[in-house]
Structure formats: C-alpha cells, structure tokens
Amino acid sequence: MKSDIQIARDIELQRIEQIAESIDLPVEQLEPYGRYTAKVPLSCIDEEKVKKGNLILVTAITPNKAGVGKTTVSIGLALGLNHIGKKAIVALREPSLGPCFGMKGGAAGGGYAQVLPMENINLHFTGDFHAVTSAHNMITALLENYIYQNRNTCDGLSEILWKRVLDVNDRSLRNAVTGLGTISDGIPRQTGFDITPASEIMAILCLAKDFEDLRSRLENILLGYTKEGAPFTVKDLGIAGSIAVLLKDAIKPNLVQTTEHTPAFVHGGPFANIAHGCNSILATKMALSFGEYAVTEAGFGADLGAEKFLDIKCREMGVAPKLTVLVATLRALKLHGGVAETEIKAPNAEALRRGLSNLDRHIYNLKKFGQQVIVAFNRFDTDEEEEISIVREHCIGQNVGFAVNNAFAEGGKGAEELAKLVVEMVENKPSQPLKYAYEPENPVKMKIEKIAKEIYSAGSVVYSSKADGKLKKIAMQSLDHLPVCIAKTQYSFSSDPKAKGDVRGFELKVSDIIINRGAGMLVVIIGEIMRMPGLPKEPQAVHIDIVDGFIEGLS
C-alpha cells in the first residue's frame, strides 16, 4: 500500500469554494488561505441547527504508543456517512509540530482517510499555533517588562506563575533561568517552557464562544500574585486588547477537505493528557451548522479526552453527543493483556482476551455519562479474522454495538458498516441526557476524587503540600466552581504508564494544581507528568525530507 503522503499527493483536490458549496456555506464568506483552505467567520454559525444536530464523539481505549487510529476512524466515519447518503462533516484538532517531528508523527489521519492538504495541515497550516505561541509569549514579555520597570517600587510581584511556550518537544526547556547578565537584561528568575498545546491561550481559543468571550477570558488569565497576595491578571497588566489582536484570525475555524472531499473543520490543538484535548467549540458548532452529522474526536483514551469533552467542553457548549464511538485495536488490547509493545502485532488470543478488561472499563465509564456506546474496531492489514471475532463476540455478549472500520485501506466504503450502525443507533437508541461526573458546586477535592475513583478506579487520592497550597488560593479567589482538567499519563488509568489493563485500587498523587482562570478550569497535575514533552531516541524528524520540491517521510 502507498504511504500516507503518496496517497495524499495522488488525490485531486477540489478548490475550497467547491467544498463550501457542497454544504451550502456561502462562498463569499470564505477567507481563503490558498486554493484548498479557508477561514470561516463566526457569523456563519447557526445556533438553532447546532442544538438540533447529531454530534458523534469518537474516543478510544487506553492507547499503545503508536496510538489506535482515532483520527483515522473519525475521518473514516465521516466518509462512511457520506458514502451511505448522509451529510456529514468532521471536526478535528490541528496537529502540533512536537509529535509530528517526535514520536507519533502527524495527526491528519492515515491511508485513504485523511484530511488534506496533509502537508500544510501537519506543518504551519494557517498559522493558528504561531498566533497562540506569539500571544502567550507576548504576555510573558510584557509581564517581564512590568516586573523590570517596577523592580524598585511597591507594585512588584511576589510570585510569578506564567511561563513561556514553544510548539516543539524539548526537554531541556522544562526548567530555565532568565534575566542573566547585567541589570539591564532583566530580573533573574527560574521559569520554564510548556509546549504550545498546553498553553492556556490554546484552551481559551478552543473554549471561547465568540471574540468578546475570547477577550474576556484573556483578561482573566492569572499571571501571579502581588506582594499583598492579591491575584495579578492580564487585566491588571492592561494588555488584553493587544493579545486579542494577535488572535483575531486564529479564532476563526479552518475549512479543508478529506481524501473523498468531505468537508472538515480543523481548529485548535490542546493535548488530552496535559490539557483538555478537544478541538474548538466554534469548529464543532460550525460542523453542526452545516452537517446532518458532525463527527469529532477527543484525545487519547476515554478516561482523558472523553471525560474532558463531556465534563468541560459539553458543559460550555450546551450540546452533548448523540452517540460515542469507542475505538479499539488488537494491538492495544494485547498490550493491556500483558504483551510487550514490541510483540503486539503477533497473534495472541489469550492476551487479547485478558486485554478486553480495558475495553470493558471504558464502556462502563462512558455509560455512566449516559452515553450510548458502540465499538469501532480499527483494522490493520496484519489482523487475523479469528482474533477480530473474539472482540466482536465479546461486544455482542456485552450488548454493545460493534463494527469493523477499514477506512484506512478503503476510504468511505471501508467505514460503511460503522456508518450504518451509527445511523441506526442515533435514530433508534441515542444517548440519554448527559450525566456529568461532578457538579460545579462540588468542592475541588470532591471533583478530583470523583474522577479518580469513578473513572480511573483509584483507591485513594493524596495531595502534595504544593497542591494543598494551591487549593487554599483557589478558595481565596472563589474559584471552587471551576471544572477540573486532569493532567496525567495517557498510557494507563493510573499515574504509572506501565500499569496496563484494568488497574484498580492505586494511589493517585496530585503534585500541583494550575489555575487557568482565563480558560475557566483547574489543571490538576498527577504524578510527574510533563507539560513539555521530550523526543524519543529516533524521532520522526530523521525520516522527513524534501526531494525535488516534494516533502517525504511525513505521516
């Protein structure tokens, strides 16, 4: 089979005006970025259609390091729905350069289920990540200037919380000292970098309802504390307008197309392990405004991305999924059955059966939210029918819908079984009204423990002295009502990435809580999770090149 980039290159793309016309989106509203991409103004969102639309969430079991193909399934499902005569649009996150050149590679789908032009989408795209990075670091520069200019006055700060960001994986930037040199070079202090998808600006971009809401959220960003212990925000710095200007175009969703010319809105890119892991509310609303079905995904496993999608994004958006599709693969299931990562491609029915406990946990958890769940088996070319049957029979025994997705190899035709099952369930057995894992009035510790014990099956939750200190500051600022966004490893229900399967009864340690006042959530750091990833021994970057003007090795 051809490589992803070869397949993408062989597709004859339609001009973006044709894609817009296919969903009755007025062409004169488009703000083109070349021939095949356009920004769409927020005025195109139809709130009445948003409320009536069929939102489909795609999530997954706990993944292996290479992932389970959730984006490919999301795109494939949209292709499949269009293949059977339904009007479907997919809404996805934008890829980050960190993983693209790091371990996982790109995030534009795979095979014959991709969003295009994949090279542009995987690289700089429309500059949204650059805008977020620039806005974040502009705040840092202006904050540093404020500190410098007020170094000899009573207006100084006693504690600074705001870091810098870059869209790269670079472990050496996790901790840094700035302001070295002479006094004219700034005030020395210890700080660090996060990756751009973990930026509070990214979260704000993805949760904002409109430009006014974006600006309001920017004003509320907590930067540090004064010498009197009062919160110091972007509003106090007086720069919200300047930062909003940097994001005036980034807030608009991006319209592209798939390998079969299905419309796709690709916008925003927070990770689900260290942030809330969902594409923008505005892009999802745009998909609901123009499609009969809107397919979207939430990052990593359902314990992370789906929980945050339902508890944070849906609460903000006021819309819930009619159905949740849970992606599973033989490889990930065998990993949870005790097989080493290097051996998961080989047949092993016994390990597969053991690994089904991880699938069952995710199904059970999603049903707690009132979600109707079906399992999408993402097929690889090495998968054996006998082992696929084991998973199918198990799901049937659990009274859970099951469909094989082969969109990677066959495009929309390969997702026909999945698409038909989705339509059947939405029309006859849709999800119940959404049941949140916690309520806003619950104390912060109760919110954390409800997720830890009800979703992760932790035995107990312990707090570091640093986390306890943050809880006091949260109470002092009356921020207890905010939702919690758990930052932990994506490879296990626990904080130990090596603990596979249906792990239970463990201790979950809260090491820190980051107050995202602007985004409107509390980021709860579990264990030693890093908000600036590192690179593997052999990063994807060594395989990427440009030959005769064509990019090679991007996947």
UniProtKB/Swiss-Prot annotation:
Keywords: ATP-binding, Ligase, Nucleotide-binding, One-carbon metabolism. It is an enzyme of class 6 (ligase). SUPFAM superfamilies: P-loop containing nucleoside triphosphate hydrolases. It comes from the Bacteria. It catalyses: (6S)-5,6,7,8-tetrahydrofolate + formate + ATP = (6R)-10-formyltetrahydrofolate + ADP + phosphate. Its EC number is 6.3.4.3. One of its GO terms (biological process) is tetrahydrofolate interconversion. GO terms for molecular function: ATP binding; formate-tetrahydrofolate ligase activity. PROSITE patterns: FTHFS_1 (PS00721), FTHFS_2 (PS00722). Pathway: One-carbon metabolism; tetrahydrofolate interconversion. InterPro entries: Formate_THF_ligase, Formate_THF_ligase_CS, P-loop_NTPase. Gene3D superfamilies: Domain 2, N(10)-formyltetrahydrofolate synthetase, Formyltetrahydrofolate synthetase, domain 3, P-loop containing nucleotide triphosphate hydrolases. NCBIfam families: PRK13505.1 (NF010030). Belongs to the formate--tetrahydrofolate ligase family. This is Formate--tetrahydrofolate ligase. It comes from Porphyromonas gingivalis (strain ATCC BAA-308 / W83). The gene is fhs.
